Amino acid sequence: DVSGTVCLSALPPEATDTLNLIASDGPFPYSQDGVVFQNRESVLPTQSYGYYHEYTVITPGARTRGTRRIITGEATQEDYYTGDHYATFSLIDQTC
């Protein structure tokens, strides 16, 4: 399940950068950004294939994409943050 909400201001600043890129439709730093997130772990609410998409939240100093992601749903401001590569998710509250 989703573990509640998290204020955008409480997330790493790179999460805001990623949300801004999503809002402007890129360009994204990784070719995998924007791919369909399949929700194989069934942590997010069950939806049809293609409902969710994933984007990398850059980890400074990391040599890979790291473990931080934002998953977007089709609803307005339905953006989830995971800092542990899909083990847990929090809905991002962009008003705080």
From Swiss-Prot:
Tagged with keyword Calcium: no
Q: Which Gene3D superfamilies match?
A: Microbial ribonucleases
Positions annotated as active site in the UniProt record? E54, H85
| InterPro entries linked | N1-like (IPR000026), Ribonuclease/ribotoxin (IPR016191)
Q: Which UniProt keywords apply?
A: Disulfide bond, Endonuclease, Hydrolase, Lyase, Nuclease, Secreted
Q: What class of enzyme is it?
A: lyase
- Report a single Gene Ontology molecular function: RNA endonuclease activity
What is the protein's major site of localization? secreted
Q: What are the transmembrane regions?
A: none
Record flagged with keyword NAD: no
* Reaction catalyzed: [RNA] containing guanosine + H2O = an [RNA fragment]-3'-guanosine-3'-phosphate + a 5'-hydroxy-ribonucleotide-3'-[RNA fragment]
Please state where this protein is localized: Secreted
| Pfam families associated with the record | Ribonuclease
The similarity annotation says: Belongs to the ribonuclease N1/T1 family.
Question: What is the name of the protein in this document?
Answer: Guanyl-specific ribonuclease Sa
